[in-house]
Amino acid sequence: MFIINQTLKADKIPKGKGEELFKQHIAWFTRHFECGDFLLVGPYTDKEMAGVMITGAETREAVEKILQEDVYYADGMAEYEVRSFKAAMISPSFAAFAGK
């Protein structure tokens, strides 16, 4: 499993394109969530223009392939920190936190 911390680089986003690019970004992570690539997706509440994704991808290469499809990946508009981890314990009540 991998956790991905994404931070957008405001200075790299072309002027007047922010809203359009964000809509494409939403479509990208929604598509990957709906097909099961992402297990969790959400924005940080304590950091602007940043969020987290958890994926059950088997390899770092598979994660990189997914990330390369993100509109922000091109031209270095975002920074992606990819960390491998093992989910040793998962609370049965985890789903109750959706949207909080």
Question: In which residue ranges do the predicted regions lie?
Answer:
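Conserved, structured core segments of small domains
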Residues: 1-100
